[in-house]
Amino acid sequence: LELLTVYLGERLGLYQALSAGGPATSAELAARTGTVERYVREWLEHHAASGLLEVDDPAAGPLDRRYRLPPGHVPVLADTGDVRYQAFNGTEIVRAARGMPQVAEAFRSGGAPPPLTWAPEGRPEFNRAVFLNLLGRQWLPAIPDVDLRLRAEPPARVADLACGTGWSSIAMAQAYPLISVDGFDLDSDAIEAAGRNAQEAGLAGRVTFTAADAS
């Protein structure tokens, strides 16, 4: 149940609005996010009862209570660029739940359930912040021979197998300006998203993606 309410907070931008705009009443948060006050009030009260939010004055009336996102919760619930960010788990739970009827049918038929579609929730980017913050800055530099080769001439060409939406490829290209990276994945939707991500990162010239079986 908590993760389902986290899904709402992530999907509707409620956490980011509290983090960026500071404490708010239910009406203020609804105005910031283009949502309905009555529903937002229920979400705020539930989150306060569960300890995810704090209330300035619990004795205040329902419409006067101001809710805040504690500083220690911001990296986990509001900052998508932080390696501790976890709000995407609510999205993944909702997305996975849509496929459960097909899983139940597979129990009866012995077949395989179809792959989960991305719509309407989208694909949680579980590894995005970790790759962008750690792969090229800590993990690869911790392997001296690999780090040296990636920095040296002639420029290395790297194959990134099962690259998903491309964040590992992008992180390597950002950390090592000489290299080129070829990402491969079976998931054509992921490859399409990876191409967009590389374009937005300004790396389309050095990072390419192909939907292919690399086995």
Where are these regions (language model features)?
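Conserved SAM-binding motif I beta-strand of class I
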Residues: 180-185
